[in-house]
Amino acid sequence: MWGFLLTVAVYIGCKKITQKRWLSKVPVILLAAGILIALILVCHTSYESYNDSACWITWILGPATVAFAWPLSQNLSVLKRNKRAVYGGLLFSCLCTIGLTYLLGRFFHAENPVIFSMLPKSVTTPAAVEISKDLGGIPELTACLVVLTGLLGGLTAHGLFKFLHIRSHAAIGVSIGATSHVLGTSKCAEKHKEKQMVLSTLALIIMALLTALAAPHVVALLEKLCN
């Protein structure tokens, strides 16, 4: 339990710190992670010990993701108007993410456990960890890659869309949800873009389901083609 309480305390503290104007651009999760790593190293505590005492956080991620369904249920009309673009785009995104990640791993001669750990990096953490386990990956590495992917998307996505003059809330929401999962979706919420948040929520849920279903089959097919 000490790991859970420490993590929550550090996160709340970092949230208040980043409200200062000169630190407003620093991602809370990145700052909190850095402080936690420093504390664990200074106290000579093993990662296993910390992880065992902070396991509640991983458990909470599941219900927290499901809670995004509330704004989705209030905006079903948005989904109905964009269903073809949403479902088609997500299927294409899922297959491309799995395929390109696998091929890049092979190109750089990465070992199978590392490649399998990378495949679900665009899926929300609870689902990504389970997918990684099923494929034979390293769950801890997967969790780190999921956070890094979400941070990168959350920090750069809206700026990139603005640069490319993409203003469609549907396109932005689906893209962010499909690639940056909960962290990207939370950025949509912070910017008070409800339509983006709704479609981003839908995208991250469907992306998790598609990746879980497609990853084993895509990997098996690519292994046959590459060997």
Residue ranges and their predicted role:
Residues L30-V42, G62-A67, G88-T101, L119-V129, ...:
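Small-residue-rich segments of transmembrane alpha-helices in multi-pass membrane proteins
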Residues M1-T7, Y11-S73, V78-G89, S93:
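Helical membrane-embedded segments and adjacent short helical loop/helix-boundary regions
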Residues F4-L6, L76-T101, A143-L152, T201-L209:
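Entry/N-cap segments of selected transmembrane alpha helices
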Residues C43-H44, H109-A110, G136, H165, ...:
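Short helix-capping/hinge motifs at transmembrane helix termini and TM-loop junctions
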Residues Q19-V26, K162-H165, K224:
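Membrane interface segments of multi-pass transport proteins and intramembrane proteases
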Residues L72, N112-L141, L145-L148, R167-L202:
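Alpha-helical membrane segments and immediately flanking helix-loop junctions
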Residues G88-A128, T149-L164:
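Transmembrane alpha-helices that form the ion-translocation and gating core
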Residues R106, A214-N227:
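Juxtamembrane boundary at the C-terminal end of a transmembrane helix
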